[in-house]
Amino acid sequence: MAAIMIGSISVPIIGSAQCATAPIGNRVNIVAPGHMAICKPQMRSHAYYKHASQKLSEQSSRGIEVLNSFFNNDPEDAFRLTRNGMSKVKKGPNGRIILRKPKARHVFERINLEKSEKEQKGKFFNGEYDTTVTSIKGVTTSKENDLGAFSLRSPFYKRTCKKEKRRITRENIVCVDDVNNLCERILKITRDKNIPVEIIGKRRNHHTLTFKKFKGSFVGKVSLAPERSQMKHVEMSYGQFDYILQAICRITSTKHVRDEDIKPGCSGWVFSTDHALTQKYSRLPYLVIRGRDDDGIVNALEPVLFYSDVEHYSFQNEVQFFNGWRKMFDKLKPHSDHTCKVDHNNEECGEMAAVLSQAIFPVLKLSCQVCREKLSRVSFEEFKDFLSRNFMTHESEWSTLRDGVHCDNVLKLIKGAVQTTQNLKLSSDIMKLVQNHTSTHMKQIQDINKALMKGSLVTQDELDLALKQLLEMTQWFKNHMHLTGEEALKTFRNKRSNKAMINPSLLCDNQLDKNGNFIWGERGYHSKRLFKNFFEEVIPSEGYTKYIVRNFPNGTRKLAIGSLIVPLNLDRARTALLGESIEKEPLTSACISQQNENYIHSCCCVTMDDGTPMYSELKSPTKRHLVIGASGDPKYIDLPASEAERMYIAKEGYCYLNIFLAMLVNVNENEAKDFTKMIRDVLIPMLGQWPSLMDVATAAYILGVFHPETRCAELPRILVDHATQTMHVIDSYGSLTVGYHVLKAGTVNHLIQFASNDLQSEMKHYRVGGTPTQRIRLEEQLIKGIFKPKIMMQLLHDDPYILLLGMISPTILVHMYRMRHFERGIEIWIKRDHEIGKIFVILEQLTRKVALAEILVDQLDLISEASPHLLEIMNGCQDNQRAYAPALDLLTIQVEREFSNKELKTNGYPDLHQTLHDMREKNVCEAVTQFMARAKLAGKILCNRAIEAILDFYGKKFDPASKRKKARIFATICSRVLYHDPSTCEEHSRCRRAQTK
């Protein structure tokens, strides 16, 4: 039998069936103490368990920290564990259980989200958020959900029917005070924060409320219909917006606004009932400014019958236009590289905007829809034609635009875009020539001509086709024309011979001593004529420093003469082998010489195997030697015995004499005297300093005629400096400067080829010096010859191009015209060379125009205008004269300068050379005055006698008593004859005194 033990009492449990038959008696049994369970009291206190639990918790935390620190040290393991923790368990193929790992991006997003939630929760618990509860949502816990499934209903539960309550409908009554208070609070916020408020009424009645500051206080302003380009009889309904107007008046202060303050732009201002303007002009409690009429201010709340009677104070049309302008102008503005500032007023800005608008979109009114649709409906060609006709119609207005508009480039662009091809005759002539031709090149010309005929109307496809056809024609023409430019230089080779040339004079035993050295004999004695006059003695005791730098007009070159002092230190000796390189020039057309379309290799620069030019290396110096031989190893010839103990170096400008000394080696002894005398007395005065290579070659040819044995003489080494257009003849002192090109010419016969006019070569015009100094010398010679007829006649016969150098100054041209040098030049050259005679005719006509101009700028402009015609004539003349190259350079410079100045003036830039022209003209006048002062006394006497004879002849023709007329006659005659202006002539006063006696 089952029983329940309660303490020491055991109570049996009897089934329900046995309860009826069980006897009534004592059913409680007392359990003996021995059969009872012993309950021992607890010996451990609560502190023990608390301490033990803390200890276990710390051990667990410590283990977790150790584990976390282990994984945190390795970011990859930490990320992998975090990713696995976020993965989902999935059943894979073959029944395997796998993890579906999320993407790394999602893992980082979740980590950041958890971190953010943790921070937000920490802030929340720290009390950083507002404690105001905005809403409470019911949350059902899981325990409540479990209790919901457990029912407490008894078997006697009976549902009570719900009694229906009677609903009483009540009207929604809104307190007016609450609405006004709400409106007032909202309007205060919008007023303080400058927020526009939209006021919406019935139907389409809506207005925008803003607050404006006027004299330190806020004034309410509502938008009205005229601001939207609309007109209404009643612009604002008082019945719909009275409560808003009341709220506006409560939060604004308009007492300081007077009648005279109401001006255009004040449309929509709201005034309260107690304001003076409201009481004066309004029949309603409030006043909203609409405008003015004859009676005063008009209230927008009251009806108006005729709109034209009211001057509306809404924003003016100009302000509306500017708002639209600024809106789109700011959207389309470019990137700025500077800080903008206001440099032009509104009127100038309006002019520029109008010019651009009418140039691109010409209309009568921008606001007219018909004008806009008219331009939008036409085709693109018709639109271009319309723009072109508009330009021609207003041509005078476009030309009179003031400079401040700065629209020149825009107008040029538009004119070029709408301009059509006017010269259709040329296009039709081309079509006549190529029509009915089926060749490829003729079809290509047709396509190009079609594109050019359309002008600005050509499409991009047609333009691309024309360019493609032009490219194919260019390629064809390039492949079939004779290549003379840089393309031909790619295959040009001019290698130096490795074998030394044989000089018979140096191989003859009769001319060699026992040491194998050349014996000068009589040649050495007669060489003194050259050494003493045109060479400078080098004194070793004074050092070599002053001879290291070799000057020439276009630059300097360093000699290796300093290396004659040889250091005994090996490192310093190796340093002496290093040269100073100039900027190396590539192989160009200036390096070659051609004749009859064939290369003359001996007159070209030496190249390497790959076609690159051969650059000069360090040339070591020697003492008292003549060094010859351009190919192979150089040959060292001792100086004549009389000069063996001395060292000589050619004076500046006479280094070409080393070529004549090399020719002297091959001269017969009995002819050495004539050879040296011809050089000293004939050739050197003719060549002077720094002559051209062409002149030196011509002199060598002259010597070769009298002494044919010198034609096979070997030349010294000649280096070519293309940068300064200079030829350097290397003597025994070598060259410390390296990087020059090397001339292949090895004998006098090779050099003589440079004297030919048929030779096409730039190097034959190179100087042993430079062209600028040569031009200055020619200018001085020209000025000197103006007042010395014999010198001028010699110049006209030998070098007629020198008169072109007079174009540097109007003063020189006028003096040459007065002395009739142009007339003499025409008489001399009109039959000898028609082109040169034409040059003198043009110069004479030019000088007549220059003499009529009184301002220097006008005179220089006339000279510049005549330069292109003279340059064209010069290109067809022979270049065998000394002044040809300087004159050609002068004309080229003037033409290019005029072209560049024209472009600058067109673009609005000033010409800054006016001061330079004034100073140059002043210097020329001083030079002319100096040469006039040097005129010979005999010339002055003859001139004065001629003047006296002329005065005697003309004095008889007029009344002797007329002093003034004689003075005018004398002044006219002097202006034709004298060098000076009559007003400054010293003889003028003496002649006048002689006439008056």
From Swiss-Prot:
EC nos: 3.4.21.-, 3.4.22.45
Give start-end ranges for motif Involved in virions binding and aphid transmission: 621-623
Q: Which UniProt keywords apply?
A: Host cell junction, Host-virus interaction, Hydrolase, Inhibition of host innate immune response by virus, Protease, Suppressor of RNA silencing, Transport, Viral immunoevasion, Viral movement protein
State a single Gene Ontology molecular function.
cysteine-type endopeptidase activity
* All residue ranges annotated as the Peptidase S30 domain in the record: 173-313
Origin: domain of life: Viruses
Q: Which residues form the Peptidase C6 domain?
A: 647-769
Q: Which cysteines are joined by disulfide bonds?
A: none
Q: Where is this site: Cleavage?
A: Y313, S314, G769, G770
Q: Which InterPro entries match?
A: HC-pro, HC_PRO_CPD_dom, HC_PRO_CPD_sf, Pept_S30_P1_potyvir, Potyvirid-P3
Q: Where is this motif: Involved in interaction with stylet and aphid transmission?
A: 365-368
Q: Where is the active site?
A: E235, S267, C655, H728
Q: Which GO terms of the cellular component aspect does the record hold? A: host cell plasmodesma
Task: Give a short account of its post-translational modification.
Answer: Potyviral RNA is expressed as two polyproteins which undergo post-translational proteolytic processing. Genome polyprotein is processed by NIa-pro, P1 and HC-pro proteinases resulting in the production of at least ten individual proteins. P3N-PIPO is cleaved by P1 and HC-pro proteinases resulting in the production of three individual proteins. The P1 proteinase and the HC-pro cleave only their respective C-termini autocatalytically.
State a single Pfam family of this protein: Peptidase_C6
| Annotated GO biological process | proteolysis; symbiont-mediated suppression of host innate immune response; transport of virus in host, cell to cell; viral translational frameshifting
Family membership: Belongs to the potyviridae P3N-PIPO polyprotein family.
Name the chain's protein.
P3N-PIPO polyprotein
Q: Supply the source organism for this entry.
A: Zucchini yellow mosaic virus (strain Singapore)
Give the classification, highest ranks.
Viruses, Riboviria, Orthornavirae, Pisuviricota, Stelpaviricetes
